[in-house]
Amino acid sequence: VKGDVVTLISENSPRWLIADQGLMRLGAINAVRGINSPSVELEYIIEHSNSVGLIVQSKEVWLKLNKKNELKKRFKFIINLEDEQFEDLINWPEFIKAGEENLLKNNSFEKYNHQINDIASILYTSGTTGKPKGVPLTHANFLHQIINLAHIADPEPGTSVLSVLPIWHSYERSAEYFFFSCGCTQFY
């Protein structure tokens, strides 16, 4: 739903990018972080961002977060980016199947009329000087980066690029969006 926040905790992968872009297409805001962050930091991000949904890289990330077995009730949904079925998390094949069924039923995907200044994502600092700070980024922020990266690089469609920085880092994300918009092949 437009404006809902979904926390996305994962490392670099094609499924991260698919989840990220799917959330943006729906008008949702994603709060992103990597799996190696301390659980207290991840819990803070979930709480601070008022997340209504959660997407995790694996069951191990979910177990790390849900030590007290209290998180499940706060979310409308929890998606596991892996194929493995675990508890009542929605695994990747189930998520894809639900999307396909919805498309067949409605003959279209739900669309969101994006506004340039709508918040697209909340990036959190590492919290080295205290609690992590949430930095809201708009679609305009990302577009500015994509446009300006074109002054630095001019790849041909099909060019192979390697993702090395954490995908939830602002520069890596901007670079991925830029290379994606150029038709490059992304490797993780």
Place the predicted regions along the sequence by residue.
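Conserved S/T- and glycine-rich ATP-binding loop of Class I adenylate-forming
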Residues: V6, L23, L54, I119, ...
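Short glycine/serine-rich donor-binding loops of glycosyltransferases
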Residues: D20, V135, A175-E176
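Conserved AMP-binding/adenylation subdomain of ANL enzymes
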Residues: L143-L162, I167-Y188
